[in-house]
C-alpha cells in the first residue's frame, strides 16, 4: 500500500469511527431518555358536571364519561370536576381530603374512559385516587377498590385493582398514589377506563352498587409512544454506518 492509499484509508477509517460513535451515542441517548410524560391534572377544565357519553379534554387526551351499567339510557349524571378548596363542593357526599386543586369525581357507579386525541397508544405510569363516600360520617374502613382497565391495540386487555384508602376519623378519604409499573409495565394502550366497585356482604367487589361506587382521580401520568420520526432518524444514522463499512470492504486492496 503506497502513501496515498494509506492516507485515503486513514481518512475512511477515521470517518467511519466518527460516524459510528455519533450513531451509537444517539442510540444510547434515546435508550436512556424516556418519552416525555403527560400529566392530566384537570386544572384547565375548571368546575363542571357531566352526564354519560359527554366528553372533555386536556393536554391531548379525550376523557369520556361513562354512566352506570344499570342505567337504562347511559346518559345519567356520572362525573364532575371540582375544586378541593371549594367548601360547598360536597353537600351530601364526603369529599376527599389533602387535595386543594381540581380533581375528577366519578359518581353514581360511573367511570371515565381516556384516549389520545390523535388515536395513538400510550402507557399509564401513575395516578392519585381516593374514595368518594356517598354520605358523610362513615366509620374508618376501606369500602372498595379502584379498577383500571386498559385496552391494547391488538384488542387485548390488562386490569389492575387498588384498594381505597381507609377513611379518616371524620369519614373522609385521603388521596393515595398508585404506581402502575408492577401491573402494566410499559404496555401500550389505545384507551384506559377507570371505575370503582364496593365490597358486598360476601366479600365481592361489585359495580353497579346502587349508585354508591364513587371515586376521585387526579394527576394521571401518561407516556405517549415515541414518534416514528425518532426511530427513522436513528435508522438513517445506522444505515450510513453500514454504507461506509460496505464501501470500505469493497475497495480494491493495493499490493504491498
Briefly describe each language-model feature range.
Residues 4-22:
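Bacterial N-terminal signal peptides that target proteins for export
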Residues 243-256:
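C-terminal membrane-anchoring or membrane-association module
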Residues 130-143:
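Extended, low-complexity, turn-rich repeat/linker tracts enriched in Gly/Pro/Ser/Thr and Asp/Glu
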Residues 119-126:
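Extended extracellular/luminal ectodomain segments enriched in beta-structured repeat modules
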Residues 227-246:
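A short, hydrophobic C-terminal helix/tail in secreted or cell-surface proteins
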Residues 38-115, 119:
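N-terminal targeting leaders for non-cytosolic proteins
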Residues 40, 44-46, 51, 60, ...:
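Terminal, low-complexity interaction segments
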